[in-house]
UniProtKB/Swiss-Prot annotation:
Residues 261-266 are annotated as: Important for the catalytic mechanism of dephosphorylation. It comes from Clostridium beijerinckii (strain ATCC 51743 / NCIMB 8052). Transmembrane segments: none annotated. The active site is at H136, K157, D175, R240. Pfam families: Hpr_kinase_C, Hpr_kinase_N. Catalyzes the ATP- as well as the pyrophosphate-dependent phosphorylation of a specific serine residue in HPr, a phosphocarrier protein of the phosphoenolpyruvate-dependent sugar phosphotransferase system (PTS). HprK/P also catalyzes the pyrophosphate-producing, inorganic phosphate-dependent dephosphorylation (phosphorolysis) of seryl-phosphorylated HPr (P-Ser-HPr). One of its GO terms (molecular function) is magnesium ion binding. Its cofactor is Mg(2+). It comes from the Bacteria. The keyword Phosphoprotein does not apply. The lineage of its organism: Bacteria, Bacillati, Bacillota, Clostridia, Eubacteriales. Homohexamer. This is HPr kinase/phosphorylase.
Length: 302
């Protein structure tokens, strides 16, 4: 699914010089500056990219003889271009207006410096075109680590999130987690309709922002750890040493997963806090608690 050029124009507040087709989409987040094409070189030209004319391209065209410029611009517009953008608020050469109208191609203008515009647009497209999915769960920011809590309905995910919020951590989203793969990072967000809301059985929906302040909710967070809740089963052999590596695959990316057995009396919020701190420690140190115990045992045996 691409991004409609019209939506890009609205979102980036661009000035329309020539309107194109309503249904034209952008399907790649790369950007092309057509200096080589305007010089007559079309090998490896990618017309499916957004085309951006900056000060350098504009100056090159300005020094060009009018007849040659008409010829080059006509050739350039013979390709299936989805969108052409001129930056710095520059006044376009009349040949561009004429050919854009002739071929019904979007031609718009930005007042930003070219490098700033390209950077802003690349980030925008990377977000809009990123692979995405929606999972059932709760996403919280615990000590700076994004933790996705999963498990069957009614097992206590939202109640645990509420306890974590009370302890100074932050909610990203409850019940539905929208996840995008942006440059290899899984970024989780809340659907717009439920931002800042938390559903607690027996209490109903509460507005976390109103009750606990603006700092209790964060707009998005990279998912670094998955904690899966399941009812305690006596016959299950749960990991007690932290040496079993289990992962959850989300959009083709493996995320470390911990299974937390739930039963009355266990303080799950404290366990999640410990998991977050332990995860951060593991990123900074190659020595695990198991290694420490083994070293102590070896010292005692010597």
């Amino acid at each position: 699914m691409g991004v409609l050029v019209k939506k890009l124009i609205d979102d980036l507040n661009l000035e329309v010089l020539v309107e194109g087709k309503e249904d034209v989409e952008i399907s790649v987040n790369d950007i092309n500056r057509p200096g080589l094409q305007l010089a007559g070189f079309y090998n490896y030209f990618a017309p499916e990219r957004i085309q951006v004319i900056g000060k350098a391209e504009w100056s090159f065209l300005d020094y060009m003889q009018i007849e040659l410029r008409k010829k080059r611009v006509k050739k350039y517009f013979s390709f299936d271009i989805n969108c052409l953008i001129i930056t710095r608020g520059l006044e376009p050469h009349p040949e561009f207006i004429k050919e854009a109208k002739k071929h019904n191609i979007w031609f718009v203008r930005s007042n930003l410096v070219t490098t700033q515009f390209i950077s802003k647009t690349t980030i925008y497209l990377a977000d809009k075109l990123a692979p995405e999915t929606r999972l059932h769960g709760v996403l919280v920011d615990v000590s700076g680590i994004g933790i996705l809590i999963t498990g069957e309905s009614g097992i206590g995910k939202s109640e645990t999130a509420l306890e974590l919020i009370k302890r100074g951590h932050r909610l990203v989203t409850d019940d539905a987690v929208d996840i995008k793969d942006i440059d290899g990072q899984l970024i989780g967000r809340s659907p717009k309709i439920t931002v800042g809301m938390l559903e607690v059985r027996g209490l109903g929906i509460i507005d976390v922002t109103t009750l606990y302040g603006l700092s209790s909710v964060v707009q998005e967070k990279e998912i670094r750890l998955v904690m899966h809740f399941e009812h305690w089963k006596d016959d299950n052999d749960y990991d007690r040493l932290g040496i079993d590596n289990e992962y959850m695959n989300i959009l083709g990316i493996n995320v470390k997963k911990l299974t937390v057995p739930i039963r009355p009396g266990r303080n799950i919020a404290v366990i999640i806090e410990a998991a977050a701190v332990n995860y951060r420690h593991a990123l900074m140190s190659k020595i695990t608690p198991v290694d420490v115990i083994e070293n102590r045992m070896n010292e005692l045996n010597d």
